[in-house]
């Protein structure tokens, strides 16, 4: 994969794996400023890609849990941040 660009054909799991690699590389502090910026840009692209995939999966799950009369059974999601 080209540095600085997220591969949008990656599975969610592969994208998370690559994101973990990017984070480890940035945490070492051994990359040059230019390389760090490229890694950061790649990481942002991977995060956006993963978020998009999760949104799509959430929509699919929502369709699957609709009741036969067309009403959706939705439970409020709770997060640690109180969103």
Swiss-Prot record:
GO biological process: DNA catabolic process
Alphabetized InterPro entries for the sequence: Exonuc_VII_S, Exonuc_VII_ssu_sf
Subcellular location per the Swiss-Prot or TrEMBL entry: Cytoplasm
Any single Gene Ontology cellular-component annotation: exodeoxyribonuclease VII complex
Major localisation: cytoplasm
A GO term, aspect molecular function: exodeoxyribonuclease VII activity
Pfam families in the record: Exonuc_VII_S
Reactions listed under catalytic activity: Exonucleolytic cleavage in either 5'- to 3'- or 3'- to 5'-direction to yield nucleoside 5'-phosphates
Enzyme Commission code: 3.1.11.6
UniProt keyword list: Cytoplasm, Exonuclease, Hydrolase, Nuclease
Oligomer and partners: Heterooligomer composed of large and small subunits.
General function of this protein: Bidirectionally degrades single-stranded DNA into large acid-insoluble oligonucleotides, which are then degraded further into small acid-soluble oligonucleotides.
Family: Belongs to the XseB family.
Protein name, as recorded: Exodeoxyribonuclease 7 small subunit
């Amino acid at each position: 994969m080209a540095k600085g660009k997220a591969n949008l054909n990656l599975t969610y799991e592969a994208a998370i794996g690559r994101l973990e690699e990017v984070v480890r590389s940035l945490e070492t502090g051994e990359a040059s400023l230019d390389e760090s910026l490229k890694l950061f840009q790649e990481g942002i692209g991977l995060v956006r890609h993963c978020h998009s995939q999760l949104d799509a999966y959430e929509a699919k799950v929502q369709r699957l849990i609709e009741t036969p009369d067309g009403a959706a059974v939705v439970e409020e999601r709770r997060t640690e941040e109180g969103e």
